[in-house]
Swiss-Prot record:
Binding site for Cu cation B: H324, H328, H366
Cofactor names: Cu(2+)
A GO cellular component annotation in the UniProt record: chloroplast thylakoid lumen
Enzyme class: oxidoreductase
Name of the molecule in the record: Polyphenol oxidase C, chloroplastic
Listed InterPro entries: Di-copper_centre_dom_sf, Polyphenol_oxidase, Polyphenol_oxidase_C, Polyphenol_oxidase_cen, Tyrosinase/Hemocyanin, Tyrosinase_Cu-bd
Annotated binding of Cu cation A, by residue: H176, H194, H203
Cofactor binding: number and manner: Binds 2 copper ions per subunit.
Transit peptide start-stop: 1-83
Location within or outside the cell: Plastid, Chloroplast thylakoid lumen
UniProt lineage: Eukaryota, Viridiplantae, Streptophyta, Embryophyta, Tracheophyta
Length: 626
């Protein structure tokens, strides 16, 4: 390894940093309760204080599930959040990043600022003769591992010799810190790339440049990042190449659970599951199936949440929710433990957004997260990228391998092959891992448990709780199921955004369910959240979210299609949680036109939400195309 790295010196690198200052239409989902329910239109909304509010707290759950995705906007979509694409951050306004409201990051996460941001060009892909191929980390040979260590070593050397060089290791790690912990604000609103539709494209661009930087440092334009293949049984352990002390890929700020060949728990939230390694692997495959198949039938119920910039609701798409977040927590140190330097852990490195990029494993983990975007689309059906212009035209700012600044757009990162890389073909056993075993022999007696009206609002989910809930329709035909997805929705989920959060949802079981065995047909899904900064200046640290679970397939598998009432059980796993309410709706799943209504200036000062929603409504039912 040493000889491989000794061929050139990082101190002789010449980059422009020295001149720096400090496809198919998507499916739209419309919610319906009883089919005879009237549709009312009004541009005025009365809030709980009796005041008229034209821009805030506009609850459109009964109109447009497409504005929420599977984990979506429950309410309070600020006007500024829906009027335009997210612009690249203004580096001149970059501020101190925060671990939470009471702790600031002890160093600046701000990127070096170009002399003139207005002159920063848009990135154009360089010509290529060969695709970079990302391979599974557990299959990497010694030659590749040596090359990878060499590249990261050279990147870390820049931290010492040229600390302001944007291609240095710490500068690259700071990108995640600034974008994810309150470093950037636009018009007074924190720019947060997590819990929003920016999650996948931001991280794809981030890894794209990181990978090219590594390749340039070792003069290998074909170098590809490895991906941690945690979705396959052979990859469900910590990649050995990252656990060798003294190497560039090692990080001492990791949890003890990663060692000794322990299998990863893709639903991990701070506590080890008391079960066998075989059951853990089975749970992992079940979670993968639920997240990428059952609960993600189309783009706005899947990978891409449509939580817009500036929204006060914090929600994630299915893959960001699980397995992305649990993997972060499983690798990081336990919160409250003592770090090697004597400080109290906030989950560093991987378990907190501000420090995650300091662990080389972060990029290997997110390489597989990025791969999931491709695998999800390859599953077929209505799983295609959305074509909303506000998403496609959202922008980020990065430096390339030569230290040159560029702006990039979401629309240019939808095809990895056009970006110059691809993934080594790997089996995906989770794709056909549909749980078939039932936890219950028959239907739970819904008359023996309280109805949802007697349970919600739920002040604290501190123990397993069961309730019954009425369905909007039963005994539906296959044609009706194809047209409308049945969605179980939990509204106004509230929790402290400084904590790890998780609860699981089961159908047709009572509160004695074994929640450590997820490979059951009754397991519907989970809600999770990582500690993060979403709104600076919130002393209560209260996050509000919505969880939506697609249950049509589950009801078929359990044999409850003809039932008017079903039983639901919630099992808390981590954190203090309250839930405002629950309901079951029917969501129309149909390929329709996408009119870029948010760009129509109905009023130059503000938009009338209801006029916009009426247009979407007409677009669906009159099959209007542009």
């Amino acid at each position: 390894m040493a000889s491989l790295c000794s061929n050139s010196s990082t101190t002789s690198l010449k980059t422009p940093f020295t001149s720096l200052g400090s496809t198919p239409k998507p499916c739209q989902l419309f919610l319906h309760g009883k089919r005879n329910k009237a549709f009312k239109v009004s541009c005025k909304v009365t809030n709980t204080n009796g005041n008229q509010d034209e821009t805030n707290s506009v609850d459109r759950r009964n109109v447009l599930l497409g504005l929420g995705g599977l984990y979506g906007v429950a309410n309070a979509i600020p006007l500024a959040a829906s009027a335009a694409p997210t612009p690249p951050p203004d580096l001149s306004s970059c501020s101190i990043a925060r671990i939470d409201e009471n702790q600031v990051v002890s160093y600046s996460c701000c990127a070096p600022k170009p002399d003139d941001m207005e002159k920063v060009p848009y990135y154009k892909f360089p010509s290529m003769t060969k695709l970079r191929v990302r391979q599974p980390a557990h299959e990497a040979d010694e030659e590749y591992i040596a090359k990878y260590n060499c590249a990261v070593t050279k990147m870390k050397d820049l931290d010492k010799t040229q600390p302001d060089n944007p291609i240095g290791f710490k500068q690259q790690a700071n990108i995640h810190c600034a974008y994810c912990n309150g470093g950037y604000s636009i018009d007074g609103k924190v720019l947060q790339v997590h819990n929003s539709w920016l999650f996948f494209p931001f991280h794809r661009w981030y890894l794209y440049f990181y990978e090219r930087i590594l390749g340039s440092l070792i003069d290998d334009p074909t170098f590809g990042l490895p991906f941690w293949n945690w979705d396959h049984p052979k990859g469900m352990r910590f990649p050995p190449m990252f656990d060798v002390p003294g190497t560039a890929l090692y990080d001492e700020r990791r949890g003890d659970q990663i060692h000794n060949g322990n299998g990863i728990d893709l639903g991990y939230f701070g506590d080890q599951v008391e079960t066998t390694q075989l059951q853990l692997m089975t749970n992992n495959l079940t979670l993968m199936y639920r997240q990428l198949v059952t609960n993600s039938p189309c783009p706005l119920m899947s990978l891409v949440d449509l939580t817009l910039f500036g929204s006060t609701v914090e929600d994630a798409g299915t893959v960001e929710n699980i397995p992305h977040s649990p993997v972060h927590i499983w690798v990081g140190t336990r919160r409250g433990s003592v770090l090697p330097v004597g400080k109290i852990s906030n989950g560093e490195d991987m378990g907190n957004f501000y420090s995650a990029g300091l662990d080389p494993l972060f990029y290997c983990h997110h390489s597989n997260v990025d791969r999931m975007w491709n695998e999800w689309k390859a599953t077929g059906g209505k799983r295609t990228d959305i074509q909303n212009k506000d998403w496609l035209n959202s922008e980020f700012f990065f430096y390339d391998e030569n230290g040159n600044p560029f702006k990039v757009r979401v629309r240019d990162c939808l095809d990895t092959k056009k970006m110059g890389y691809d993934y080594h073909a790997t089996a995906t056993p989770w794709r056909n891992f549909k749980p078939k075993t039932k936890a219950s022999a028959g239907k739970v007696n819904t008359g023996s448990i309280p109805p949802e009206s007697q349970v919600f609002p739920l002040a604290k989910l501190d123990k397993a709780i069961s309730f019954s809930i009425n369905r909007p329709a039963s005994s539906r035909t296959q044609q009706e199921k194809n047209a409308q997805e049945e969605v179980l929705t939990f509204n106004a989920i509230k929790y402290d955004n400084r904590d790890y959060i998780r609860f699981d949802v089961f159908l047709n079981v009572d509160n004695n369910v074994n929640a450590n065995e997820l490979d059951k047909a009754e397991f519907a899904g989970s809600y999770t959240s990582l500690p993060h900064v979403h709104r600076v200046g919130d002393p209560k640290h209260t996050a509000t979210a919505t969880l939506r679970l697609a249950i049509t397939e589950l009801l078929e598998d359990i044999g409850l299609e003809d039932e008017d009432t079903i039983a639901v059980t919630l099992v808390p796993k981590k954190g203090d949680i309250s839930i405002g309410g629950v309901e079951i709706k029917l969501a129309i799943v149909k390929l329709v036109c996408v009119v870029n209504l948010l760009t129509l200036q109905l009023n130059k000062d503000r938009f009338c939400y209801d006029s916009v929603f009426v247009c979407w409504f007409v677009c669906l039912f009159f099959n209007f195309h542009v």
